[in-house]
């Protein structure tokens, strides 16, 4: 098992999860974070840190592993992030919205740290 970041992170990107990860397995996109499933040690300390409940065990993945694939693919090309940055100023406007991945996801990498 590994943990994955899901749709709820898009445009919110709080990053509380980043600083508690003991193996630094988070990677940063412009408006979304992912977990590298090959680096995640399944400890679960990141899951309760997310205020929008975007982090789930891959056993709760929907759509035949959609989120596991997204996390694995983008962890290969986005920079590693180990220090919490500033979340987007407008994040509260998107916290309760659903279907954010299809509407707002950006493939552009973040800055990393």
UniProtKB/Swiss-Prot annotation:
Q: Which UniProt keywords apply?
A: 3Fe-4S, 4Fe-4S, Electron transport, Iron, Iron-sulfur, Metal-binding, Repeat, Transport
Question: Which part of the chain is the 4Fe-4S ferredoxin-type domain?
Answer: 2-30, 31-60
InterPro entries for the chain: 4Fe4S_Fe-S-bd, 4Fe4S_Fe_S_CS, 7Fe_ferredoxin, Fd_C, FdxA, RnfB_subfamily
Q: How is the cofactor bound?
A: Binds 1 [4Fe-4S] cluster. Binds 1 [3Fe-4S] cluster.
Q: Which SUPFAM superfamilies match?
A: 4Fe-4S ferredoxins (SSF54862)
Q: Name one Pfam family in it.
A: Fer4
Which cofactors, if any, are listed as required? [4Fe-4S] cluster; [3Fe-4S] cluster
Q: Which amino acid positions bind [3Fe-4S] cluster, per UniProt? A: 9, 17, 50
One MF term from GO for this chain?
Answer: 4 iron, 4 sulfur cluster binding
Superkingdom per UniProt:
Bacteria
Residue numbers binding [4Fe-4S] cluster:
21, 40, 43, 46
Q: What is this protein called?
A: Ferredoxin-1
Its source organism is Caulobacter vibrioides (strain ATCC 19089 / CIP 103742 / CB 15)
